[in-house]
Amino acid sequence: MLAALIPVSPLSNVKSRLKEFLSSKERIDLIKNILLDTYEKVKSCVDACYVVSKDDEILEFSKNLGIIPIKEDLNTKGLNEAIEYSLNIIKEDSVLITPADVPLLKEENLESIVKKSVENSVIICPSRGGGTNLLLLNPKNCIKPQFEGFSFLKHIKEAEINNLNIIKCHSFYTSIDINTVEDLGEIFIHGKDTKTYKFLKNLNIEAFPKHSSAGRFNIIRKSQ
């Protein structure tokens, strides 16, 4: 059986690189909308979906969606320890891990990825910056999670050390995560069917092409 695990940082620290553009409440609402989009895409591909966080608000929000909440132990430090803690609670044999900032996941991509999974394998989907935006472990404890930094290469190395079958899946939609204001532009181009897009539109945010080599988009917020 396959579970999905979505780690979420405490909402007090969420998406700090957007703080000059979005208020604290807006950043919290943004991550909730991305989480909702993520859950709607993964739920049909897995047997159960979990969220791990230290944040009671996000755990309650997740529970109301039908996601199983895991309250991080107070002694866990960082993302990787939170994931390891969760893997010892999750009852399913294998697990698909994806961060809560990947709003463009497509159900058809996930179905294709899940079908590739075999026993003693690791499926890795990189982010644009060399991180990992999706990691499918079969079985769930076959490697130690190595998120943060150039985690794509770290996960490959960890899988090689453990003599596992390594399956690399390069997908544009899976590679997009939201960390900066400019990243929001990808949602306006590729995510018009998402709740995240509707949320941003309701804030009167618009994206325009940038006609220079300095970036991809101009993201503006119209006065109401």
Swiss-Prot record:
Pathway in which the depicted protein is active: Cofactor biosynthesis; coenzyme F420 biosynthesis
A single MF term (Gene Ontology): GTP binding
EC numbers on record: 2.7.7.68
Pfam families named in the record: CofC
Reactions catalysed according to its record: (2S)-2-phospholactate + GTP + H(+) = (2S)-lactyl-2-diphospho-5'-guanosine + diphosphate
Keywords recorded for this protein, A-Z: GTP-binding, Nucleotide-binding, Nucleotidyltransferase, Transferase
Organism domain of life: Archaea
Keyword hit for Transferase: yes
GO biological process assignments: F420-0 metabolic process
Intrachain S-S bonds: none
Entry-linked PANTHER family: 2-PHOSPHO-L-LACTATE GUANYLYLTRANSFERASE
Similarity field: Belongs to the CofC family.
NCBIfam families found in the cross-reference section: F420_cofC (TIGR03552)
Described function: Guanylyltransferase that catalyzes the activation of (2S)-2-phospholactate (2-PL) as (2S)-lactyl-2-diphospho-5'-guanosine, via the condensation of 2-PL with GTP. It is involved in the biosynthesis of coenzyme F420, a hydride carrier cofactor.
Assembly notes: Homodimer.
Protein name (database record): 2-phospho-L-lactate guanylyltransferase
Gene that encodes the chain: cofC
